[in-house]
Structure formats: structure tokens, C-alpha cells
């Protein structure tokens, strides 16, 4: 049973502003309100490119729910940022022919915030909570009975004025999205009947996504240019579309054209200091730092101190792609370059 207290700390914790990386898969403010990106969202599973296994499983679950005339089981979607978790949640609501209310866990600071959302739901509707691993303890505990028994157990007041109240809720579906599955507590995680990992996209899938978006924003994108952009998009549609928009800016302003060739792609990305491997300055500094230390294993905290970056940012944002393309490896003693990574950074003759 959760307790609603008037003594909750409602202060906001300020966040330091970070330099924008075009190859960072996290969403930025501009993309949250960009109409073109919203238009690029598919309207059905048929239009959604990639994630075939997940789509197949979800279709079966949705059809089974319709057959039984029940709400879909609570669903947890996890994976790296920018892979389409929000889009999938909206498509589920479309396929279920119901409404979807969208919220972000950091905005649900007080228990009454989640209570208001739950009380506003109707039978069969969907509540989507992004970054669900960031729910505070009191808010999370309110969800336990709501998810399992479709009721709210509230304790209001204090001391002798304390009273308990149970409010029945309509049967709804909670869809949670997270980039950090391990950060979700076991009691919350166990209440999701469906759990799916959103995988990185193949180059062919990204090629199709980029081509479709280019057509949407009236760009004539040559096939080899599209392929080149797909290869450096880190398996992430959000990065692919962000890079395409920067290429469009370069083509229209510098070249006065909407026709995108491979040459324009290369020049546009070079102006943003992104090379043909999709690496930016931070990636190259990371590799150079390892190279300058004679490729001895180095601890993450030491690398972070040397580069002036947060160790968590390096671990979760920079390292995954460098490991994916085989440029670095993690060892018990620290990080070190692979032969591929050493060859790459040595050929550039760059110094940290």
C-alpha cells in the first residue's frame, strides 16, 4: 500500500547542458516537436520497417486480446534509445483501436501525478510510460496494485487522521519503455506479461527508412548515398534521420540542391567532423587516449578523467558502438584497443 505524503520533495534537480552529438541516439528537444519526424512515424505494423519477430509476437498477443475482448497484457519494451519504442507503443494502441496516453517517468514526480493519469483511463485504454526505470519509489508502488488488481490503494492524511481508500480502475494496459532493464525493480518488472527487446536495425532496414524519409521531405537521394548513410547510423533510425537532415541542410545551403549524391554526403558529414566510419570527435579522442597509453588496459574512470567526460556517458553512449565495430574491447583490467582500432586511429595520425 502506497502512502501519499504532503512532505515530498518536489524540487527539480538541474542537469548540466551537454554538447549535442549527431551520433547520439538520445532524443533532443528539436526532435520532440519536429513535424516531419512525426509524419515519418508508421501508421501500422505493416508500415513499420524491421523488428519482425517482435511485430509477430505482438500481433498474436493483440489478436488474442481482441478475441477474448480483454485489455492487452502489460508490456515492457527495452533497448537502446532511438529504436522505436514509443512508435511501437502508439502502433499497439492503433492495432487495439484504443487511445494511448503518453507520459515520461521523470515528469511523474508526485504520486498524485500517476493517480491522475490512472483515474483518467477508460476501459481498454493504454498508458505509455517512457523511461519507466526512472519512476520514484512511491509512484512505482502505486502501480503494483493498479497493474495486478486494477485498483488503487491509497493512504491519506497523517497520524490520527489517517484513512485508507481503495479505488477500482478500469482494465487498462501499461506499456513501459526503458533503456536500462536492470534498473527496473523486480516487483515492477514481474508485473509485465510481455517483455520485448528492441534490437538494432540492419543496414538494409535503415536504407529503406532513410529512403522513405528522404522522399517525405522531398529529397532525391541516390542509392549509394543512402547506403553510405545507413552504414554509419549505428543501427539506429533516430541517428539516421538526424544525419539525413544535416545532409539536407548542407545540400540546400551550400550546393543549392535537393539532389543528394555520395559526394554531398561525404562533404556534409565532414563539415560535422563525422568520418566514413560514423565516428565523431569524442569517439576519436577515446581511441586516441587508449593509443597514447601504449594500448595498456585503462580503467573507465581514468579515461573519463583524461577526457573530461562522465564515465557513465562513455560507458553507455560511446563504448557500445566502438565495441560493436570491433575497435575496442573490455577486459578485467580495463579498456584497450583491438588491432582494428589501433590501425584506424594510427592511420588518422591524430593525437588526443
Swiss-Prot record:
Its EC number is 3.6.4.-. GO terms for biological process: DNA recombination; DNA repair. One of its GO terms (cellular component) is Holliday junction resolvase complex. It comes from the Bacteria. Gene3D superfamilies: 1.10.8.60, P-loop containing nucleotide triphosphate hydrolases, Winged helix-like DNA-binding domain superfamily/Winged helix DNA-binding domain. Residues 202-273 are annotated as: Small ATPAse domain (RuvB-S). InterPro entries: AAA+_ATPase, AAA_lid_4, DNA_helicase_Holl-junc_RuvB, P-loop_NTPase, RuvB-like_N, RuvB_C, WH-like_DNA-bd_sf, WH_DNA-bd_sf. It is found in: Cytoplasm. Pfam families: AAA_lid_4, RuvB_C, RuvB_N. Signal peptide: none annotated. Mg(2+) binds at residue 86. It catalyses: ATP + H2O = ADP + phosphate + H(+). Residues 276-352 are annotated as: Head domain (RuvB-H). Homohexamer. Forms an RuvA(8)-RuvB(12)-Holliday junction (HJ) complex. HJ DNA is sandwiched between 2 RuvA tetramers; dsDNA enters through RuvA and exits via RuvB. An RuvB hexamer assembles on each DNA strand where it exits the tetramer. Each RuvB hexamer is contacted by two RuvA subunits (via domain III) on 2 adjacent RuvB subunits; this complex drives branch migration. In the full resolvosome a probable DNA-RuvA(4)-RuvB(12)-RuvC(2) complex forms which resolves the HJ. The RuvA-RuvB-RuvC complex processes Holliday junction (HJ) DNA during genetic recombination and DNA repair, while the RuvA-RuvB complex plays an important role in the rescue of blocked DNA replication forks via replication fork reversal (RFR). RuvA specifically binds to HJ cruciform DNA, conferring on it an open structure. The RuvB hexamer acts as an ATP-dependent pump, pulling dsDNA into and through the RuvAB complex. RuvB forms 2 homohexamers on either side of HJ DNA bound by 1 or 2 RuvA tetramers; 4 subunits per hexamer contact DNA at a time. NCBIfam families: PRK00080.1, ruvB. Has 3 domains, the large (RuvB-L) and small ATPase (RuvB-S) domains and the C-terminal head (RuvB-H) domain. The head domain binds DNA, while the ATPase domains jointly bind ATP, ADP or are empty depending on the state of the subunit in the translocation cycle. During a single DNA translocation step the structure of each domain remains the same, but their relative positions change. This is Holliday junction branch migration complex subunit RuvB. The lineage of its organism: Bacteria, Bacillati, Cyanobacteriota, Cyanophyceae, Synechococcales.
